[in-house]
A protein has these predicted regions:
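Short beta-to-alpha linker loops that shape the active-site pocket of alpha/beta-hydrolase fold enzymes
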Residues: 78, 106-110, 182
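Alpha/beta-hydrolase active-site loop
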Residues: 113-134
Length: 189
């Protein structure tokens, strides 16, 4: 009986943890990821753009490139505290199907890391893509930075923050797309 009670308590704890970690949009992204056709692109996973564990990106190379060979660099949301590139497979897959090459990146998370670590990671990923464009068979001449929520903040910050003055790829960025991000920010301190 004691063992049964302990097993029930463990199951309750597991269920509570699952409930706390579940986000409704996770279900939607998993569904969309599953339904996206996979025959119009090639995917390379977990490419290391830096030395930190989360300095990884997935690269989706289209099989039907647009004339300008645009590259979308997508940054996930998650309040800088959670989120993962795998939550946004559908972004990479959908845009690759439409003729874009797409890099979907992970970045270091809070609270272990604070601003500007997230933005620095994005700058480092862009640098990696530029330095390895021949090996990766991509063009970085026409980049589009795109992010959701915290990721939208990161893409704006890599171009417009005071720290961005050392960012040498601004001329290659042809568009910035922010999805539900915080856009009014003051870089004080």
């Amino acid at each position: 009986m004691k063992q049964l009670i302990q097993q029930v308590q463990e199951n309750v704890i597991r269920a509570k943890n699952l409930y706390q970690e579940f986000r409704l949009y996770d279900f939607a992204s998993y569904s969309i990821n599953y339904l996206t056709p996979k025959d119009t692109f090639e995917k390379e996973e977990h490419l290391a753009y830096g030395l930190k564990a989360r300095n990884r990106l997935d690269l989706y190379r289209t099989k039907n490139p647009k004339k300008q060979k645009p590259l979308i660099v997508f940054v996930h949301g998650g309040s800088w505290q959670h989120g993962n590139k795998r939550d946004y497979l559908f972004i990479g897959e959908t845009f690759a199907r439409e003729g874009f090459d797409v890099a979907v990146i992970n970045y270091q998370l809070a609270p272990e890391n604070i601003f500007p670590a997230f933005v620095d990671d994005l700058a480092q990923a862009i640098h990696y893509l530029n330095q390895n464009k021949v090996k990766l068979n991509i063009s970085t001449d026409n980049m589009i930075l795109m992010g959701h929520s915290a990721g939208a903040f990161n893409v704006m910050s890599v171009v417009y923050s005071a720290q961005s003055q050392n960012f040498k790829y601004k001329d290659q960025i042809k568009a910035i797309v922010g999805l539900a991000g915080p856009y009014h920010f003051d870089y004080v301190g």
